Amino acid sequence: MSSSRPGFSCSWLPYLLVLPQLAITAVFFLWPAGEALWYSVQMLDPFGLSSEFVGLSNFIALFHDEYYLASFYTTLIFSSLVAGIGLVVSLFLAAMVDYVLRGSRIYQTLMILPYAVAPAVAAVLWIFLFNPGLGLITHFLASLGYNWNHAQNSGQAMFLVVLASVWKQISYNFLFFLAALQSIPRSLVEAAAIDGAGPVRRFFNLVLPLISPVSFFLLVVNLVYAFFDTFPVIDAATGGGPMQATTTLIYKIYREGFAGLDLSSSAAQSVVLMLLVIGLTVIQFRFVERKVRYQ
């Protein structure tokens, strides 16, 4: 019995259907990326009215700027903490729901709520909790003899923005991990238990390999989130301070491009950030994906 694949009556209809998405990609990604590449090799005035070709001078100046190199290091630390802690905590919570509280819709709903909160609002929420004078958490820490002031302590400021960023992303990770865990046949877990495998061994030798495709997908998503989507959290919580301790690459681009009106430097930083993200993505797909089991 032969089966025929349904097709379009008009040969140009498929292209017409994808045209809006192609237009959006061209206008909001390709065009800005091209502009950034062009501006990165130009010396622009603050208003962008005149320019002079300077080649790679903007990039050379970047890597001789100690503040830029510091923001580079801060970005790597911040993104690693946000992605790593977020994935581990989300997987733990999803495992608790799947194995302990399975079917608890109220608990699942409460876990999803943080995703509906805007990043800036999430930052403000944690600022209130950690306010040096009025915060509930700081009051508790003071009773233990610990002085908290993230406006003066760089380590505390980094802890605050990481905490707010992780809390904001946990719901997204939780949904994918829970769906992956609940898709595993119970018969496999029960068979492993009958063979004498304990809960920890079952999780690491059976469950974790089966959800590795979802884990790999979330690793890529969380790194991109940490690089780009945490800007509102940092801006609302610390403003990049104290002493640029929480200034990531994306926030430094904003500060120099929009606040300092140094368009050439911000464009060069945008190109470096784009190349960094592309490089990390290639590394993940070349090396990390090899350990992913899709069957």
UniProtKB/Swiss-Prot annotation:
Residues 1-11, 102-109, 179-207, 284-295 are cytoplasmic. One of its GO terms (cellular component) is plasma membrane. Residues 72-284 form the ABC transmembrane type-1 domain. Its main location: membrane. Keywords: Cell inner membrane, Cell membrane, Membrane, Transmembrane, Transmembrane helix, Transport. The chain crosses the membrane at residues 12-32, 81-101, 110-130, 158-178, 208-228, 263-283. It is found in: Cell inner membrane. The keyword Heme does not apply. One of its GO terms (biological process) is transmembrane transport. It comes from the Bacteria. InterPro entries: MetI-like (IPR000515), MetI-like_sf (IPR035906), UgpAE/MalFG_permease (IPR050809). Belongs to the binding-protein-dependent transport system permease family. UgpAE subfamily. Part of the ABC transporter complex UgpBAEC involved in sn-glycerol-3-phosphate (G3P) import. Probably responsible for the translocation of the substrate across the membrane. This is sn-glycerol-3-phosphate transport system permease protein UgpA. It comes from Yersinia enterocolitica serotype O:8 / biotype 1B (strain NCTC 13174 / 8081).
